[in-house]
């Protein structure tokens, strides 16, 4: 099944630590995901780093 090879992660703002986005990616990736996304709390585009979703 393809769903077993994907995991859900959280993207959290690096400035205010607000958890804004959920993202699904493959389990075989060894690097931490880091994207520029819009943060509603900050009101601007900031870097969002990967964290674990419960």
Curated annotation (Swiss-Prot):
GO terms for biological process: translation. InterPro entries: Ribosomal_bL33 (IPR001705), Ribosomal_bL33_sf (IPR038584), Ribosomal_zn-bd (IPR011332). It comes from the Bacteria. Pfam families: Ribosomal_L33. Signal peptide: none annotated. The keyword Metal-binding does not apply. GO terms for cellular component: cytoplasm; ribonucleoprotein complex; ribosome. One of its GO terms (molecular function) is structural constituent of ribosome. The keyword tRNA processing does not apply. Keywords: Ribonucleoprotein, Ribosomal protein. NCBIfam families: PRK00504.1 (NF001764), rpmG_bact (TIGR01023). Belongs to the bacterial ribosomal protein bL33 family. This is Large ribosomal subunit protein bL33. It comes from Elusimicrobium minutum (strain Pei191). The gene is rpmG.
């Amino acid at each position: 099944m393809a769903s077993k090879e994907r995991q859900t992660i959280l993207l959290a703002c690096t400035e205010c630590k607000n958890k804004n986005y959920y993202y699904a990616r493959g389990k075989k990736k060894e690097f931490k995901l880091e994207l520029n996304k819009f943060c509603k709390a900050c009101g601007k585009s900031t870097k969002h780093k990967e964290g674990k979703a419960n």
